[in-house]
């Protein structure tokens, strides 16, 4: 059995395809995509069929002019297959921002649930050990820490300064040596990236932070220094979670030498700041919040969803008229 024309497939044929996929998976262990490839059915088409309330192309149900289009369902399923580890909420706003499909979270949830494509993502658990201070604007509080990076049979040290309000990486440096002088130099560099700010600086009790060089920079700029609880990394949870993200997205592969490692980390930082959507930021990027633009993004997203809804109404009305 091989389908040549997918533009108009009878309901019984669709049902047969789904039955074949299920039986083949149960009896031989073949994955869905392998069976679909043998049948000549694209995965996006299959999941669009599966997501429909009924298999018939034309139904007798009441006309709903704002009903999601079949091609939008297929696009949502196809997008989810490209990002299998990402939850539906983040997928929703990734698609809206990229102009793939502009619908709300509940619609994406229903489509993916019907297609059995909901990602079972790991829910983050807020740390009970973080300090109660909650910044209300960028650069009121920075968190800093060092992450060990293994490259070419030795360790380097990734020093990062994370803005607590926006999760933006204000400054980073891959250090060759880890000491007070190196850290104080990079703290000074971080302060120079945003002139006139006096953030609270949160760090652990490591000797690279607790020393005369770092203390001198803090005193010169009249900063408030916050030391976390000893042997309690959760107290610095914001930067700890960032470090975990770097490890996860790099797969701990930073290249074969220091210069390659710098390049890998620079790309990761750009992706983290400018592209990666954060649940705690309303599924926006750290750069959006650090630049004070979340309201602009909210308005643009609302505009896109409204425009897509109007377009969906027009298309549905045309199709209903043609089907009459």
Cite the ranges covered by each PLM segment:
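RNase H-like polynucleotidyl transferase catalytic core
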Residues: 200-205, 219-238, 252-258
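Mobile-element integrase/transposase regions
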Residues: 96-97, 101-102, 106-162, 168, ...
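C-terminal domain-tail junction helix/linker
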Residues: 219-221, 244-324
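Residue-level signal for the short linker/turn that defines the boundary of a DNA-recognition helix
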Residues: 29-31, 86, 256
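Mobile genetic element proteins and their domesticated derivatives, centered on retroelements
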Residues: 35-36, 46, 76, 91, ...
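Basic, flexible linker segments flanking DNA-binding modules
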Residues: 8-12, 47-141, 232-233, 290-294
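Double-stranded DNA-binding cores of transcription factors and transposases
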Residues: 7-43
């Amino acid at each position: 059995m091989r389908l040549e024309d997918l533009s108009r497939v009878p309901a019984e044929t669709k049902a047969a395809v789904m039955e074949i996929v299920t039986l083949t998976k149960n009896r031989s262990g073949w994955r869905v995509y392998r069976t679909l490839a043998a049948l000549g059915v694209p995965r996006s088409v299959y999941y669009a069929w599966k997501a429909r309330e009924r298999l018939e192309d034309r139904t007798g149900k009441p006309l709903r002019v704002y009903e999601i289009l079949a091609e939008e369902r297929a696009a949502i399923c196809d997008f989810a297959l490209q990002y299998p580890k990402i939850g539906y909420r983040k997928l929703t706003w990734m698609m809206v921002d990229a102009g793939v499909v502009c619908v709300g979270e509940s619609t994406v949830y229903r489509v993916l649930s019907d297609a059995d494509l909901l990602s079972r993502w790991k829910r983050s658990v807020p740390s009970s050990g973080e300090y109660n201070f909650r910044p209300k604007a960028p650069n009121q509080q920075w968190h800093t820490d060092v992450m060990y990076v293994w490259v070419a049979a030795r360790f380097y040290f990734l020093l990062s300064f994370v803005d607590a309000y926006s999760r933006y990486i204000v400054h980073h440096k891959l250090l060759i040596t880890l000491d007070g002088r190196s850290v104080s130099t990079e703290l000074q560099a971080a302060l120079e990236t945003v002139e006139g700010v006096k953030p609270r600086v949160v760090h652990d009790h490591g000797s690279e932070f607790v020393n005369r060089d770092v203390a001198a920079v803090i005193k010169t700029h009249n900063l408030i220094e916050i030391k976390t609880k000893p042997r309690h990394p959760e107290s610095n949870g914001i930067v700890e979670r960032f470090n975990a993200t770097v490890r996860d997205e790099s797969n701990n592969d930073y290249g074969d030498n220091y210069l390659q490692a710098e390049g890998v980390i620079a790309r990761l930082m750009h992706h983290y700041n400018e592209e990666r959507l954060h649940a705690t930021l309303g599924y926006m990027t750290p750069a959006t919040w650090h630049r004070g633009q979340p309201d602009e993004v909210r308005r643009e997203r609302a505009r896109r969803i409204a425009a897509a809804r109007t377009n969906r109404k027009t298309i549905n009305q045309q199709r209903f008229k043609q089907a009459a």
